């Protein structure tokens, strides 16, 4: 009997430690936008609470800060129906999720609750008996991150020739509105070799989300995917949390030794949602009109992707740029955090050049780890040709260019049509890596030494 009790205690000790024997409660003293003010003794930042509504239902809220007078809670949904004096019951746990294979094929909200699909969801309440993990967590220590050495072809010539990705790499996809970033993201999901795909769709229009589900994801792709969605009409807390929920789900599959592809669209909308939370919490505005919490949370989010001893998370984060300017504060910060960036050009999109990837402006910081010397040399020569053509493009349009002054520029002008044809590609027509490399070598070999 004692042995059985000891075994039960060891099994459930970690779970029991999350709960308190005494339920301390409080009451709402003020509602300020998305923030609720109250007094809760012994509360901790990150703890979840249940707030009673006037109709008898409950609203989940999370403790996000304190002042000298009160505790600040951020509502995880719309605070409609909350009255001053409404009872608050601390749950004694932080936001946690349970992840298993039943999530594959499911569509979840920003907190991990099911939106579509016959599944339990990932959100773990206080009575959840699954093994759970925290949504807000630290990244792996740097000493536990293996070096990126394996290439991960995308089937897209413009990427595989000049910006070849590696398994476990974190890449930004920078684009303005209407440049085809969502279409490119879906194409990457179809083509890249991975076990599980986790989509984080933040701030999307509801119509676009439904079209994405119906037209971009076939049954085969859907069967190995998890979608975490927080549309533009959802609360700022849910939009910001969706990025962490998607990342935590990807981490859980990585811990099981799987190759995970994390596609997060977009970091800009995540930053905007966190800006709303920060302003409501009384944070001062800093660089670019953003509160300090945005610059704190961006690296905490993206550093959680990457290689581990067991598996990998290859992450692609989209970033919205206005007027094709890379000087946007979010874009500038994200570019400094990631292992590479792919830039989509509005000018190329307007010419019908798809995918509209500006190879000259795009870069991979781990390219030398996953490519051979011949590939690197050909990539450098391709960039040399593109740069040479860009320098004389205006002269060519004006009819003022005179050949013979520079053999490299002359070659760039002669090969421009061939290069553009090589970099263009139709959807759903992936090209093998070796075929891409052969085409790249065939073009760049014509450049004089």
Curated annotation (Swiss-Prot):
Annotated catalysed reactions: ATP + H2O + cellular proteinSide 1 = ADP + phosphate + cellular proteinSide 2
UniProt keyword annotation of Nucleus present: no
EC number per UniProt: 7.4.2.8
Listed name of the protein: Type 3 secretion system ATPase
GO molecular function: ATP binding; ATP hydrolysis activity; protein-exporting ATPase activity; proton-transporting ATP synthase activity, rotational mechanism
Alphabetical keyword list: ATP-binding, Cytoplasm, Nucleotide-binding, Protein transport, Translocase, Transport, Virulence
Record function comment: ATPase component of the type III secretion system (T3SS), also called injectisome, which is used to inject bacterial effector proteins into eukaryotic host cells. Acts as a molecular motor to provide the energy that is required for the export of proteins. Required for type III secretion apparatus (T3SA) formation, proper protein secretion, host cell invasion and virulence. May play a critical role in T3SS substrate recognition, disassembly of the effector/chaperone complex and unfolding of the effector in an ATP-dependent manner prior to secretion.
NCBIfam families: fliI_yscN (TIGR01026)
Main location: cytoplasm
An annotated GO BP: protein secretion by the type III secretion system
Family the UniProt entry places it in: Belongs to the ATPase alpha/beta chains family. T3SS ATPase subfamily.
Subunit structure: The core secretion machinery of the T3SS is composed of approximately 20 different proteins, including cytoplasmic components, a base, an export apparatus and a needle. This subunit is part of the cytosolic complex. Forms homododecamers.
A single GO cellular-component term on record: cytoplasm
UniProt subcellular location: Cytoplasm
PANTHER family to which the protein is assigned, alphabetical: ATP SYNTHASE, SPI-1 TYPE 3 SECRETION SYSTEM ATPASE
Organism encoding this protein: Pseudomonas syringae pv. tomato (strain ATCC BAA-871 / DC3000)
Binding annotation for ATP: 178-183
């Amino acid at each position: 009997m004692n042995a059985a009790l000891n075994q039960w205690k060891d099994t459930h000790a970690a779970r029991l430690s999350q709960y308190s024997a005494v339920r301390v409660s409080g009451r709402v003293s003020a509602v300020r936008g998305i923030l609720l003010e109250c007094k809760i003794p012994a509360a901790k930042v990150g703890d979840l609470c249940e707030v009673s509504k006037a109709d008898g239902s409950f609203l989940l809220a999370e403790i996000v800060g304190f002042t000298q007078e009160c505790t600040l809670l951020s509502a995880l949904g719309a605070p409609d129906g909350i009255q001053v004096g409404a009872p608050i019951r601390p749950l004694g746990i932080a936001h946690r999720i349970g992840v298993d294979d039943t999530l594959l094929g499911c569509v979840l909200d920003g907190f991990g609750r099911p939106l579509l699909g016959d599944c339990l969801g990932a959100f773990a309440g206080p009575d959840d008996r699954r093994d759970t993990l925290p949504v807000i967590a630290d990244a792996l220590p740097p000493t536990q991150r293996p070096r990126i050495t394996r290439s991960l072809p995308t089937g897209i010539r413009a990427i595989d020739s000049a910006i070849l990705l590696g398994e476990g790499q974190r890449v930004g996809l920078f684009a303005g509105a209407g440049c085809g970033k969502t279409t490119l993201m879906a194409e990457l999901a179809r083509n890249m070799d991975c076990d599980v795909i986790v989509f984080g769709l933040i701030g999307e229009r509801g119509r676009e989300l439904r079209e994405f589900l119906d037209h971009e994801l076939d049954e085969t792709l859907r069967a190995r995917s998890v979608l975490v969605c927080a549309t533009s009409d959802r609360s700022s807390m849910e939009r910001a949390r969706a990025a962490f929920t998607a990342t935590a789900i990807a981490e859980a599959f990585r811990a099981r030794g799987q190759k995970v592809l994390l596609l997060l669209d977009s970091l800009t909308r995540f930053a905007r949602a966190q800006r709303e939370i920060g302003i409501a919490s009384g944070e001062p505005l800093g660089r670019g009109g953003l509160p300090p919490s945005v610059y704190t949370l961006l690296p905490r989010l993206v550093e959680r992707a990457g290689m581990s001893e067991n598996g990998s998370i290859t992450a692609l984060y989209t970033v919205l740029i206005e007027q094709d300017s890379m000087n946007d504060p979010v874009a500038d910060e994200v570019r400094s955090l990631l292992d590479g960036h792919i830039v989509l050009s509005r000018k190329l999109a307007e010419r019908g050049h798809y995918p509209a990837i500006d190879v000259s402006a795009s870069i991979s910081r781990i390219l030398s780890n996953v490519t051979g010397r011949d590939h690197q040399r050909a990539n450098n020569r391709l960039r040399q040709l593109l740069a040479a053509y860009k320098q004389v493009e205006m002269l060519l349009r004006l009819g003022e260019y005179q050949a013979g002054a520079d053999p490299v520029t002359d070659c760039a002008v002669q090969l421009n049509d061939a290069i553009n044809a090589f970099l263009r590609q139709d959807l759903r027509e992936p090209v093998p890596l070796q075929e891409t490399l052969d085409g790249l070598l065939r073009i760049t070999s014509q450049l004089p030494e």
